[in-house]
């Protein structure tokens, strides 16, 4: 079809003459094989993320965008970690008194740096609607071109307190399974 030809032509032009880098000040930090060898499999305990975040901030990072959803408590550290061991609630509580809540450590690092944008996720399941808090467009305004979702999955509240903002990463692949565009706004 004409649409497929247009997509393939666009892809070809992107390969032979890609856009020039806008700035060398933007750095994408990825998890590599050597990181996995050093820290173990993903997900990492949040106290490790707090240390890595502090290193980014100390290195001069002005903005850190986590493209990972932190919607649940860290089960790899602190009191949550104790739940994976068979013991009585009394023993678990006594041991828990000596452990630091790793989510609080990560929240502290986020709050101290004042340079974080966290991620939320969207839901299409009508049975699990989570209300939004701050609309940026008034109710009743019809924008038929917006992608529409029934709710969001926000990050943990105590992580968002010190964050600059919360973003959403929504992709909509074309029929050939290639993502060529992303929406700037969505309707929830």
Language model features with spans:
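Non-transmembrane functional regions of envelope-associated proteins
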Residues: 1-188
């Amino acid at each position: 079809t004409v649409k497929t030809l247009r997509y393939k032509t666009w892809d070809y032009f992107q390969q032979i003459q890609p856009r020039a880098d806008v700035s060398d000040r933007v750095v994408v930090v990825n998890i590599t094989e050597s990181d996995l060898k050093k820290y173990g499999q993903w997900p990492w305990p949040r106290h490790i993320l707090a240390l890595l975040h502090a290193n980014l901030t100390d290195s001069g990072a002005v903005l850190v965008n986590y493209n990972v959803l932190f919607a649940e408590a860290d089960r790899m550290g602190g009191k949550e970690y104790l739940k994976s061991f068979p013991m009585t609630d009394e023993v678990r509580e006594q041991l828990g008194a000596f452990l630091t809540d790793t989510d609080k450590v990560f929240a502290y690092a986020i709050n101290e740096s004042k340079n974080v944008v966290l991620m939320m996720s969207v839901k299409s399941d009508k049975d699990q609607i989570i209300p939004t808090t701050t609309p940026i467009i008034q109710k009743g305004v019809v924008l038929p071109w917006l992608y529409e979702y029934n709710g969001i999955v926000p990050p943990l509240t105590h992580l968002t307190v010190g964050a600059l903002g919360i973003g959403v990463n929504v992709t909509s692949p074309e029929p050939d399974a290639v993502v060529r565009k992303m929406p700037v706004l969505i309707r929830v």
